[in-house]
Amino acid sequence: MEHYTEFLPISRADMEARGWDQLDFVVVGGDAYVDHPSFGTAIISRLLEAEGYKVGVLAQPRYTDCEDFKRFGKPKYGFFIGGGNVDSMVSHYSVAKIPRAEDEYSPGGKGGARPDRSATVYTRLAKQAYPDLPVILGGLEASLRRFAHYDYWLDTVLPSIAEDSGADIISFGMGEHQTVEIARRLAAGEPVESITDVDGTCYLTDFDHLPERYVECAGFRKVASDKVAYAKACRIQMDNQDVVSGNIIVQKQSEKYLVQNIPAKPLVRWELDKVYALPYTRRYHPIYEAMGGVPAIREVQFSIIQNRGCFGGCNFCAIQLHQGRRVTSRSADSIVAEAERMTHEPDFKGYIHDIGGPTANFRFPSCREQMLRGMCNGGKHCLAPTTCSHMIVDHSDYLKILRRVRELPGVKKVFIRSGIRFDYLMADPDDTFFKELVEYHVSGQLKVAPEHCAPNTLAYMGKPPIETFNKFKDKFYELSRKAGKKQYLVPYLMSSHPGSTLKDAVYLAEYLYKNHMRPEQVQDFYPTPGTVSTCMFYTGLDPYTLKPVFVEKTAEGKALQRTLLQYYEPRNAEKVIKALKMTHREDLIPLLVPAEGRIAVQRSARRAEAADVTIHGDGTYTVRPRGKGGKPQSRSAAPAGRNPAGRQPSPGARFAPHSAPAHKPKSNQQKENTSWKTSKKKK
């Protein structure tokens, strides 16, 4: 296996091979060790290495005790810890709170290699191993839990992860500036308790040591008992996440106060170029080879990240609270150089899978005003419900980069697989980029995210009206025909988002039918910590208006909305018919429900009318045909995948940091998939 460089030490033997007696820092991660800039552990460890520190990587350590945290011996300065690229709870559980058996960020794609709430567990174990050493906790999982937050898996409000974990400092956002400054100050001998002024960090303190100027939001106990207070706190937090206009935020936790400093400045272009030019091997560590490798590398190994941040402002998205709404991007030379290096890799077949980021076609900040006054607050969006008149729309720079990469020797195709923001694309009066996108950069299918079609639901999502998507869709197929290509759109669609009623779901099903769209896999809204949509889900309030928002929380209601997205499946006929009857849209039954499904529902109804069903106390039931002799049949009433008592394992069962998981997934559960095929119905 050829590499650009060596992997960083993962064991004491690796340290000794380099002639090191002691590390300066240990970087702990919840993912398997993949030395690629798409992985947070790789970036932070390589960045520290570039600053001259001796760094070791502790990937997916054992979490039954703290012994694995002593693998390298005691580091000189401390630990940098992250939970992984994906929130560990999302990684472990479906939106229905069913345990997953798979984890693409673990060896062999198997689950169980990290604990629930891994960021908290790892921090506690590091503190247990070396109580006197500083622990800096960062990454997505910590960023989204820096304030008191609603926890969907326990269905309760939890305090800041700073309190639960015991971390000395929470580094929120992408973390490069914070990491370098904190490391420098620790190495200079400064006590971690005095490092309280770094932008992009949070810490706990008492009332007497609060900063002079700050805005305060309702404390943990208040937001845990008062949903209006929770919604107001959410708005304060969202309105102060801009590096120009944001203020220091204070929120009382159980005893101490959480202080969030203003966000760190985004990396400027040369800094981004430097980060992505670090000597990554771009591969998973060889120790995973015998285990089947790390599946997550497949999609990103030959992909290039060209930007960070997103001003799209979707309410359900964590990016605005983590990466921020200000877009920064790498230089064309940096991107082309990375593509050229790829062509020399032994596994490269000529295909670059993606040149993108959170939103592929964003290259610059949305407008000049935000550079002076910061991003707009109060729930205002650059693109929804309409495109802001101040927004700068320009694809020319991105187009030049794509052209240069296409011309590299050894490159056959350059695809764009990360999300294209179609409303931004449609706002560009110059359609040159759109034409070349269709002709050169679509691998048969293009992923886009209309999410829904009902106006009310789209408004709560922070998405543009469906008419914008319709115009984009028509133009995409028109340009594809002109280019002589048979290409399809793959729309991201979501059910049960706050504000989405059953009538809205029926409206979406009707839209899909009329537009010949048949989603093969569907996604239910997943309430993850820190987002505006999760605030609406928990409180039933819009945090910007405090007006009530309908939220579907019942299992039956969610199932009806979800199955309406797959109205065409005969197995969904019963639920689809029920939803249509409940919304008085029986006129749609012949259109949405296939004949096979309607017949099956009728037969099932006749059988139910002709039988006596007795449910017994032990969870079994007996079916006895009416008017017939026959031996009754006894069956288990417990749904598949549950224990005889019908109980689900609790997602909170693995919260204890010093014990093994209380259960292991036994079935091959599927993750929520955000990929659907769309077909044009033949006329």
What label would you give each PLM region?
Residues E2-Q22, A32, V228-S303:
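N-terminal [4Fe-4S]-dependent radical SAM core
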Residues V27, I43, R62-Y63, R341-V490, ...:
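Conserved SAM/AdoMet-binding glycine-rich loop
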Residues D31, M291-A318, T343, Y351:
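N-terminal pre-triad scaffold of radical SAM enzymes
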Residues T64, E193-Q241, E255, A264-L267, ...:
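Terminal amphipathic helices with adjacent charged low-complexity linkers/tails
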Residues D87-A96, L144-R146, E176-E181, T205-H209, ...:
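Flexible glycine/acidic-rich beta-alpha junction loops that bind and position SAM and/or redox cofactors
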Residues D168, V275, C310, I335, ...:
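Conserved, mostly hydrophobic/aromatic
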Residues S604, E609, V613-K683:
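Intrinsically disordered, Lys/Arg-rich low-complexity segments
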